Amino acid sequence: MKDFVAIDFETANNCRTSACSVGAVRVRNGEIEDSFYSLIRPYPNYYKFTYIHGLSCEDTDPADHFDKVWPPLKEFIGDLPLVAHNSPFDSSVLRDTLEHYGFSCDTPFFCTLKAARNCSALKGLENYQLHTVAAYFGYDLANHHHALADAEACAIIALHIL
C-alpha cells in the first residue's frame, strides 16, 4: 500500500466517544507527506487513562470538541484509506465519536496488527504490539501513546507489510 493515512486515537476513559487526542500521518507514493495532530476535549470529559498517555483535563479543557476537529481531519484524510495498529479500536473510536456529533465516515480501515500477525517475516517476534513491530522495522517509538508518534510508527509498519 503506497497511499494511505495512518491514524491513532488516545481516549480519556473506556467510552469510545472519549477521544482526547488524534494523530494522523499521510503517506503518498510510499513516502510520508504530512502529519496532523490535535488535542480533543473528550466526551464524557473525565480521565481514567492519564497513566497511559499522560493527558488530563488540564491539557484538553482548552481544546475543541471533536465536531470542530473533524472538518480539518476529514480534509487531511481526503479519499485515502485509513490504517491503524489494532484498527478495531481506532475505527470504533472514530465511528462512535462521529455518530455522537452527527457525522459519519465510510473510509475503509486496514489493520497493521492483523497484518503483522500474518506476516511470515515477523513470526519470531516476542509480541505484535506497536512498539515491538515498529522497532523491528527500525522505528524508535520513544513517545509511545502519543497519538502522532503512534501514527508515525503505524505508517512505517504499513509501508513494510501492507
Model-predicted regions and their roles:
Residues 66, 114, 150-151:
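Short secondary-structure capping/turn micro-motifs that flank functional sites
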Residues 69, 117, 153-154:
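Short Asp/Glu-rich motifs
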Residues 1-107, 127-145:
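Conserved non-catalytic scaffold segment of RNase H-like nuclease domains
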Residues 146-159:
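Acidic, divalent-metal-coordinating active-site segment for phosphoryl/phosphodiester hydrolysis
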Residues 97-100, 118, 136, 157-161:
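Active-site catalytic microenvironments for nucleophilic, acid-base chemistry
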Residues 77, 101, 111-112, 122, ...:
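Short alpha-helix boundary/capping motifs
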Residues 110-128:
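Short alpha-helix plus adjacent loop in nuclease-associated cores
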